[in-house]
C-alpha cells in the first residue's frame, strides 16, 4: 500500500480540530505548523481508528497510522493538544507540542483499545519531540491508567519534557512558530 504524502502544511484559526485523522488514514505529513488562534479550535490532532464506531471494532484494519514529522503544534488551551483514541496508531517525529496557556495536557487518550494497540505493531510512538503543557497526559473515557497513557509517550527516544510535562528541564524558546536555541539543540531522529 502506498502512503499519500503532504509536505508543508500550515493551519491557523480552525474552529475544530486542525488535523482530524480517522477511518484507516495512513498518510505522511511533513513540515507541519499549527498555531491556534486565541478564541477558536479544539485539539490540534484528533486521531482515531474507526471514529467512535464500536460496532465495527476499534482495531479494525486498516488501522489509522499517520506519520507526522518535522512539526510545530502550539495550542491555545481550548483542549488537550493531541487526542489519541479508539485503537489508533501513529508515528510522531521531530516536533514540538506546546500549550501556550499552560492549562491543558499535551496528550489525551481515550478508550482501552488505544492501550491494546500499544502492545501491537504498529503502535503510537513519539521520537525527538519536545513537550510543554500543564501535564504530559490525561485520560478520557474508558482509557486505562495514567501510567499507560504516559508510557505511550515516554517509551520513545530523545524526547524533551518541561517540568509539568514529564518532570524534565525543557524550557521552550520558540518565537512565534520559529524554533529557538532549545529546540535547535534537540537530537534529530531519522
Language model: regions and residue ranges:
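Extracellular beta-rich repeat passengers
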Residues: 1-4, 8-190
Amino acid at each position: 500500500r502506498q502512503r499519500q504524502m503532504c509536505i508543508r502544511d500550515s493551519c491557523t484559526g480552525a474552529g475544530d480540530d486542525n488535523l482530524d485523522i480517522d477511518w484507516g488514514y495512513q498518510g505522511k505529513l511533513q513540515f507541519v505548523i499549527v498555531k491556534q488562534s486565541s478564541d477558536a479550535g479544539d485539539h490540534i490532532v484528533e486521531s482515531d481508528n474507526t471514529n467512535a464506531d464500536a460496532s465495527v471494532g476499534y482495531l479494525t484494519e486498516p488501522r489509522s497510522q499517520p506519520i507526522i514529522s518535522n512539526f510545530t503544534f502550539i495550542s491555545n488551551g481550548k483542549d488537550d493538544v493531541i487526542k489519541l483514541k479508539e485503537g489508533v496508531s501513529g508515528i510522531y517525529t521531530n516536533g514540538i507540542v506546546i500549550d501556550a496557556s499552560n492549562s491543558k495536557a499535551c496528550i489525551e487518550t481515550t478508550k482501552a483499545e488505544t492501550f491494546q494497540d500499544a502492545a501491537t505493531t504498529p503502535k503510537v510512538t513519539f521520537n525527538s519531540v519536545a513537550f510543554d503543557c500543564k501535564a504530559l497526559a490525561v485520560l478520557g473515557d474508558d482509557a486505562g491508567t495514567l501510567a499507560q497513557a504516559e508510557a505511550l509517550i515516554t517509551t520513545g527516544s530523545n524526547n524533551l519534557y518541561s517540568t509539568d510535562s514529564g518532570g524534565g528541564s525543557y524550557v521552550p524558546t520558540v518565537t512565534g512558530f520559529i524554533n529557538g536555541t532549545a529546540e535547535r539543540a534537540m537530537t534529530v531522529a531519522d
